[in-house]
Amino acid sequence: HQPLQLLMAPSGVDKGQVRADQLIVVDQICNVLQGEGKASAETSLHLRIVEATQAGAVLHTHSVAGTVLSRHYEGKGGIPLEGWEMLKGLVGIKTHATSINIPIISNSQSMQELGNAIAPSLKSAPCGFLVAGHGLYAWGADLEASKQHLEILEFLLKVKLTQMQIAHQS
């Protein structure tokens, strides 16, 4: 059994422009084993997700829709999404006639607090959760699945926000 290691972009590097030679390898206690740079403050949260879900990859974004909706639904049990065809792109969902709930945890500067807050929801979360006022974490069996889950959840969050804006204007 190999000890857990993550391949990740170091802190301070533009994640949209990161090159393979800039990536670092981090162990289960956030020590950099290979590469130049420092592990980000959020490394321990990524580790917590991998340990709980057996994910092969974890991705994180800071979209407008995810950030705004996470604040709006904070304390309301998450963001309900149902009836959208795109739900079928999430692992385990076979029909659009499905309802999911994206969990939201309150933001904290303590990654330990964030990890403890999301831990009870990780097994049942639909491949992702939101940190209120911050952004979306999504995961999957590998990088491709994680990217698919991230893109689908971001799409559904944008749909939800647009739906709310239309309802408000009507």
Specify the residue positions occupied by each region the protein language model found.
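Glycine-rich flexible loops
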Residues: 1-170
